[in-house]
Amino acid sequence: MEFCVLFGGASFEHEISIVSAIALKGVLKDRIKYFIFLDENHHFYLIEESNMHSKYFAQIKEKKLPPLILTHNGLLKNSFLGAKIIELPLVINLVHGGDGEDGKLASLLEFYRIAFIGPRIEASVLSYNKYLTKLYAKDLGVKTLDHVLLNEKNRANALDLMNFNFPFIIKPNNAGSSLGVNVVKEEKELVYALDGAFEYSKEVLIEPFIQGVKEYNLAGCKIKKDFCFSYVEEPNKQEFLDFKQKYLDFSRNKAPKANLSNALEEQLKENFKKLYNDLFDGAIIRCDFFVIKNEVYLNEINPIPGSLANYLFDDFKTTLENLAQSLPKTPKIQIKNSYLLQIQKNK
């Protein structure tokens, strides 16, 4: 089976997506037929496999590549010989952050009937917004930490709105990769941390920070009616997983398995199933959990994890190919114009 990797995007995680695509190239190798790069101006470009390395993208603004146009079933390439359709194999949406995880690309791909692996529109909207993710989890009976949502209008009242004490953690509500995330241990650090978070999002989420909390990551997908899980990872961290810890090492081959009881592993999987069903059908996602006093709490849902979290799976290639055979299908609406014909008949 062949794939097309779509990466880049107009987001703060643009470079992360490039590194993610390069890492996935090393895993899938010749199974990737095309690499399609989306730049910050929303132009699509075909990148040769030999150019899939960091040095090329560090200088890509100096390149003169012919832009492609997204159309039904593929991409349109114009040349002096005329227009040519590049028919795409199954697309892997590997655009992190805005464009890829907020629903824009899912909408485009569905609109043009291009088959893809990745979160659909509703899944993207709910998981990209951390506050909406918490509401979604609560409705499913999955625990989350206490939290406060701030915007520019109420940020001055942050301390009054919180029902928890220092230390706490501040996160942009619409950004991933730990960008703009800071731990605040005393009041004098608050303004700086808020300024940093508001650079990435119009809304900011504040949660209590629990030193030394156990954190577990679990990736997976649903293939037909059965779930396929990765093994559980317990990430090595200091205070929290910052940008460098999260993304500058996801090209690793394998991550260490967590040492946890069968009962706890089953709890993590049951919570994952609740969150996945059926919203995330067609996607490989990673759920990051906290365990506090033997209770499982959702930290966040990563709808497009770095390099699709391939390093957590014992047989990632088989998982991906099986998922490709179990993608959700949008029913085609038959337009019959019977109502219009009846109106015409009655005239």
From Swiss-Prot:
Cofactor list: Mg(2+); Mn(2+)
Gene Ontology terms: cellular component: cytoplasm
A biological process term (GO) from this entry: regulation of cell shape
Catalytic activity: 2 D-alanine + ATP = D-alanyl-D-alanine + ADP + phosphate + H(+)
Keyword Membrane: no
Domain ATP-grasp: from-to ranges: 134-332
Pathway annotation: Cell wall biogenesis; peptidoglycan biosynthesis
Keyword match Cytoplasm: yes
Note describing how the cofactor binds: Binds 2 magnesium or manganese ions per subunit.
Binding site for Mg(2+) 1: D288, E300
PANTHER family for the chain: D-ALANINE--D-ALANINE LIGASE, D-ALANINE--D-ALANINE LIGASE B
NCBIfam families in alphabetical order: D_ala_D_alaTIGR (TIGR01205), PRK01966.1-3 (NF002527)
Free-text function comment from the UniProt entry: Cell wall formation.
Family: Belongs to the D-alanine--D-alanine ligase family.
Name the UniProt record assigns to this protein: D-alanine--D-alanine ligase
Species: Helicobacter pylori (strain ATCC 700392 / 26695)
Lineage: Bacteria, Pseudomonadati, Campylobacterota, Epsilonproteobacteria, Campylobacterales
GN (gene name): ddl
